[in-house]
Each structure stands twice: as structure tokens, then as C-alpha cells.
Amino acid sequence: MPARFDCFVTGTDTEIGKTLVSAVLLTRLADAGYRAAGLKPIAAGTLAGAPTRTNEDVEQLRAAASVNLPFDTVCPWLLDAPMSPHLAAAREGVTITLPPILDAFAHARSLADAVVVEGVGGFRVPLSDDFDTAEMAVALGLPVVLVVGLRLGCLNHAALTAEAIAARGLHLAGWVGNVVDPSMAGLDDNVATLRRWINAPHLGTIPRLPHADARLAAAHVDIAPLLARTAETRR
């Protein structure tokens, strides 16, 4: 049986590839023999015209997972409006709270060897007036995988996010670069700078793909450093 592996995926911003990287991790874990489950506890924006109320990111995670979980477990908080979760929740007259998220994680963990939990937006996105994504990550207490959207400004965003993760006592287990702007000047030099600045393994850089395909992207990501640390922790 594989050693237990769980992680929390966050990013330097919104729309920088967290869902793609989460799906890549699930794909790689399943290939390594794990029963892998994905959670996106909070999703803002429902698919227009879908036969049932759902979210595109949630469906990508469900497709990549090797453990089939009920939708409400994968995403206990689904909001209609594609905006900051605290604003979307206020529009619907609800308040996002932590217990349903922790319950969903516990349920997923009971059925899987590995659970990948994807955050929403960046690391400090508000979830309510007094609760944000960072606090959700702390409550889960998982090692963090950081997705860096490679575009102008990524060095500052990555450094600030890595500092915020460390300041909360969380372990940054690795980071993945995702090319958001293929015309970015000095892209390779920026990646080299990130490798020096971020005190965590660089798991890979995903080039700009024709479409967000987890199997194609998985060829550019190595999860061995994540699994090696898990094995060391169990010794």
C-alpha cells in the first residue's frame, strides 16, 4: 500500500492553473498506485447550460481522480457568481464556514490513500468577513504545493505567497510553474530566479498547452520529491 499523501494546492493568483496542477497531481498519484481523491471545497461560478448545478474546476478534479466521490464531498460550498467567494456567498445569503470543509476532507480521507485539496483564488482570498483561504489551509494542516503563474509580476507574487505560507507554520512541499503568458520576456530567467528564491523543490514547469489537459501537463511535473518526503516522514 502506498504511503499516505495529502496536500493543499494554492496559487499566486486566480486563473493561473491551480486546477490543472491539482488534476496533474491526481493523475500522477493514480499512476503511482494511489487511490486519489480531489477536493475543491469552495467554487465560485456555475456552468451555464449544464444539466445539473456544477462547476468546471470541480468537474476537472472529478475526472482526474481515481476515487469517485459525491459532488457535495468534492465541493461542499458551490456558489453561483464567478467572483470572490465572500461576495458570492453574501449574494446568496450564506456564510462559508469551516466544519463542512473539514467533514468533506475526513470523508475523502477515509476512502482514499491521497487527497489533493485545491484552494480558491490566491492564498489570502476572503471566504467571509473574518475567514480566509489561509485559515482554511491552517485548519487542514497539510503540506502546500504552490502554483506560480508565469507572467510579469510572478516573482513578487511568489515571494509574498511563500512568506505567507511559512508565517502560518505550514510546510511548502514544492512548487510548479505554469506558463500563463508564453510571450513573457525572460521566462527562463524568471524560473531560475524562482528556483533560487523559493525554499522548496521545483516540481516542474508546464508550458502553454493548446488546452488544459492533465495527462499532457503531467509529462512536465515530477511528484517524486513530494512522495519522498512523505516516505521520510513515516520512518
UniProtKB/Swiss-Prot annotation:
Binding residues annotated for Mg(2+), in chain numbering: 19, 57, 118
EC number(s) from the headed UniProt entry: 6.3.3.3
Cofactor: Mg(2+)
Listed GO MF terms: ATP binding; dethiobiotin synthase activity; magnesium ion binding
Active site, UniProt feature: 40
Pathway: Cofactor biosynthesis; biotin biosynthesis; biotin from 7,8-diaminononanoate: step 1/2
Origin superkingdom: Bacteria
UniProt enzyme class: ligase
GO CC annotations on file: cytosol
Alphabetically ordered keywords of this record: ATP-binding, Biotin biosynthesis, Cytoplasm, Ligase, Magnesium, Metal-binding, Nucleotide-binding
Subunit structure: Homodimer.
PANTHER family: DETHIOBIOTIN SYNTHETASE
Descriptive protein name: ATP-dependent dethiobiotin synthetase BioD
Organism: Ralstonia pickettii (strain 12J)
